[in-house]
Amino acid sequence: MASGKEIRSKIASVKNTQKITRAMEMVAASKMRKAQDRMRASRPYADKIRNVIRHLAQAHQEYQHPYLTSREAKKVGFIIVSSDRGLCGGLNTNLFRTLLRTMREWDEKGVPVELCIIGQKANAFFRRFGGSIAAQATHLGDSPHVEDLIGTVKVMLDNYQEGNVDRLYLAFNEFVNTMTQRPEIEQLLPIDANVGKTDEKLEHRWDYLYEPEAKEVLDQVLIRYIESLVYQGVVENIACEQAARMVAMKAASDNAGGFIDDLQLAYNKARQAAITQELSEIVGGAAAL
């Protein structure tokens, strides 16, 4: 059995660790709420752009933009969103496992995969894994802006425009609630055909006056739409990261508390054994006299 001094040292060490995990839990909770606010604020923008695209596509069906046109998949691309830091449970691992399964399915069809990485964890993992990485963006912080993503996303959009990639997907963690984060793989390009389907409300073919031309507006709006979806995925992944970290740090704090209780019990037993031994020695010495 360890001595009382050693056990006291362990108790002090675990208590210090518990203070750190509790502080990290509170910081993660605060950052999660801020990320949720950004996540909710970005949704109306994406929804409004989607409506504009839908209207433009229906009112000008003679213009077949490449982003709205489906073609045979000879090569696919994935924009992968992960965290820059760890200590967030199995958040990244679950996403990577889902991705590897999907990538394996494409590989079995003889379709190569190209990757665009957002986040240090995905960058490290897929460089070890041996994936073909076309672009990357890391260390964006807890409050990224759309401008931080434009250059990285443009690489994949150019690849799609030039025919080097025939499908483009976004892989990120979807925020369900504080306790649940779900890996999600969402198709970005070609944009869902439902966007171009005829709507009964637009049968009368009313339209806006565009400056510049509707074709140029659609070209720009489609790019902004994809950028907004990627940004939405990034801020949602940050909310997932902070929620997972908060839960992980709470579990660590609780485990530290249980460990401290066990160590305290061991210390009490060691102290009791030492007192009993001293009493036995005193009694033995008195009997010898």
From Swiss-Prot:
<dbReference type="GO" id="GO:0045259">
    <property type="term" value="C:proton-transporting ATP synthase complex"/>
</dbReference>
<comment type="function">
    <text>Produces ATP from ADP in the presence of a proton gradient across the membrane. The gamma chain is believed to be important in regulating ATPase activity and the flow of protons through the CF(0) complex.</text>
</comment>
<keyword id="KW-0375">Hydrogen ion transport</keyword>
<dbReference type="Pfam" id="PF00231">
    <property type="entry name" value="ATP-synt"/>
</dbReference>
<keyword id="KW-0406">Ion transport</keyword>
<dbReference type="InterPro" id="IPR035968">
    <property type="entry name" value="ATP_synth_F1_ATPase_gsu"/>
</dbReference>
<dbReference type="GO" id="GO:0005524">
    <property type="term" value="F:ATP binding"/>
</dbReference>
<dbReference type="GO" id="GO:0046933">
    <property type="term" value="F:proton-transporting ATP synthase activity, rotational mechanism"/>
</dbReference>
<keyword id="KW-0813">Transport</keyword>
<dbReference type="InterPro" id="IPR000131">
    <property type="entry name" value="ATP_synth_F1_gsu"/>
</dbReference>
<comment type="subunit">
    <text>F-type ATPases have 2 components, CF(1) - the catalytic core - and CF(0) - the membrane proton channel. CF(1) has five subunits: alpha(3), beta(3), gamma(1), delta(1), epsilon(1). CF(0) has three main subunits: a, b and c.</text>
</comment>
<dbReference type="GO" id="GO:0005886">
    <property type="term" value="C:plasma membrane"/>
</dbReference>
<keyword id="KW-1003">Cell membrane</keyword>
<protein>
    <recommendedName>
        <fullName>ATP synthase gamma chain</fullName>
    </recommendedName>
</protein>
<dbReference type="InterPro" id="IPR023632">
    <property type="entry name" value="ATP_synth_F1_gsu_CS"/>
</dbReference>
<keyword id="KW-0139">CF(1)</keyword>
<keyword id="KW-0066">ATP synthesis</keyword>
<keyword id="KW-0472">Membrane</keyword>
<dbReference type="GO" id="GO:0042777">
    <property type="term" value="P:proton motive force-driven plasma membrane ATP synthesis"/>
</dbReference>
<keyword id="KW-0997">Cell inner membrane</keyword>
<comment type="similarity">
    <text>Belongs to the ATPase gamma chain family.</text>
</comment>
